[in-house]
C-alpha cells in the first residue's frame, strides 16, 4: 500500500464496510425460504478483502509509527492523521462487523 494511495485505499475500505453491512442486512431480511447463498458468497468475499485491508493498514501503521523516515514526503501531522484514520476504520471493521 503506497502512501500516495492512502486516501483511495481508505475510501475503498469504507465502501467495503458499507457493502458488507448491506449484504448482512439483505441476509437478515430475507424472507423465509428465500435463498441467500449468493449474498453469503458475496459477503465472504467482501469480508476476505476487508481482512486484507486490515493487514495492509496494520503494516502501514507500523511503518508510520516505527519508521516514519521511509515517508519523507508525508508530514508528521499527516502521519498522525493517517494513524488515527487507520484506528477508526479498524474500529469499524472489528467492532461493528465481528
Locations of the language-model features?
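Structured binding elements
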Residues: 1-98
